[in-house]
Amino acid sequence: LLQAMDAFVFPSKWEGLPVSVVEALSSGLPCYISDTLTHDVDICDAVTRLPIDDPRPWVDSISLPCRVDARRDIEAAGFDIHDSARKLVDLYEKAERLANERKCR
């Protein structure tokens, strides 16, 4: 779905770590996000922060942008889906081992 988009627009007032923004960046989309979001997603030049309380800058900024290839910047910032998946599998395997050890006691 993201590959069919020209840009990712995320005017949110409150978010933790907006993973959807990281996913959009990984797909090469320029991201227009509200200035209220965490700076943890400022991992490449494809992020444009806009004021959440003023629609005019949003309208002015979003105009059929060019897709960007930001994959290296994203991975360098520690957002690698393969690495994250491996860490999650490791965590589940460790939890399973601990649960099995407790059953054997």
What kind of region is each of these model predictions?
Residues 1-5:
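Short alpha-helical donor nucleotide-sugar binding micro-motif in glycosyltransferases
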Residues 67-105:
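A charged, aromatic-enriched C-terminal amphipathic alpha-helix characteristic of glycosyltransferases
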Residues 6, 16-18:
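Active-site helix-initiating loop/hinge in glycosyltransferases
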Residues 13:
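Aromatic "clamp/platform" in nucleotide-sugar-dependent glycosyltransferases that forms part
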Residues 26, 30-34:
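Short hydrophobic beta-strand element within catalytic cores of glycosyltransferases
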Residues 18-26, 40:
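Short alpha-helical segment that forms part of, or immediately flanks, the ligand-binding pocket
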